[in-house]
C-alpha cells in the first residue's frame, strides 16, 4: 500500500481505554457473526460492520492497529446504531478470515489492509460477498460489491508538481534521493509534467554528501528557483541548508518524524493528508487521539477515520460519490476513491494549510 504501508515493527497497541465503541464480538475462530449473542432491541436498524485487519501479521500489525483506532474513534460516536466485529488474520489467511466472519447479516466489511491481501481477496471469487471497502490499491477495477479507499504517494507527487506551476516556478529541478519511495514520487511528478507543461523538467540524482555544494552551486548559476524533492526526511534535513532562496516541494514520503524535527524546513511546501496539514479542522475534533502518533501512523489513523465515516455515510446504500476526507478530497470512480491531497507549508516547526 503506498507510502503509508511500510514494514512497521510489532508494537503492543490496543484500542483506547474504555472506548465507547460497541464491539459485538472480537475475532474467535470457532464463532461466526450469526453465533454472536443476541442483538439489542433496535437490531433491525443497526449497521453491522466487520473490521478485517491483519492484526496477527508481524509486519502489518502496527499499521492495522492505527487503522483500527481511527475507525474506533468514529464508531464510538455512533454507539447506539453501529455494531462492529473485529476479524483479525495473519498474512496468509485473509480469505479464510472473510469466510469465517462475514455472512449475509453484515452490511459492510472494512479491509483488508495490504496490497497482497487486497488482491488475494478480490480474486478469490467468494460465494457470499458483502459490500467491502478495501484499504490498499488493487490496480484494476474491483469486483462488485467491492470498492477501494487507498492513500497513494502518486497523487501527492502530482499535487506538488501542480503547486510548483501555480507558484510560477520558472526553472524547477526534480531531485531524486535514494529512498524506498523516491522513484514512485519521481515518476508521478514527471507524468504530471509531461501531460501539462510544454517545457521539459530538469532532473538530478543526489550523490554523496561531499558533492552537494558543487551541485547546488551549479543550480544557482543556472537560476534554478524550485526543487521538487523525491526522497526521505533525513536527506531533506541535511540538504535543506544548501537550498537557500530556492522553493522546495515534497510529499509525505519526506515527512516521517515529529514536527519538532523540522526546525530548518520553514517555507517547504508539502502535499499530504488534511489530517496532518489542517489538523484543527472542526470535523476532525471528535476523532483526535489522546496522544498524537508519528506522521506515518497518523496517516493510517486518518485512513481508519475515513473508512468508518464512508461506510456510515453509505449505510445500506451506495458509497458517497465525493467526500471531504481526512486523507484528502475523495472522488469515487470505477469503485475506487481518487484522492486529492492538501498543500501545506512548514513554518517554525508547525504545518499550515496553503490557500483557502
Task: State what each model feature region is.
Residues 31-69:
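Extracytoplasmic "Venus flytrap"
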Residues 62-66, 79-141, 235:
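Beta-alpha junction/loop-to-helix N-cap segments that form part of ligand/metal-binding clefts
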Residues 81-103, 156-159, 184, 206-217:
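Structural motif
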Residues 102-114, 132-135, 171-176, 201, ...:
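Periplasmic-binding protein-like
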Residues 139-163, 264-275:
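Short beta-strand elements at the ligand-binding edges of bilobed clamshell
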Residues 146-204:
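An alpha-beta-alpha
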Residues 194-195, 222-224, 237-305:
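Extracellular/periplasmic periplasmic-binding protein-like sensory domains
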Residues 287-356:
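Segments of small-molecule ligand-sensing domains
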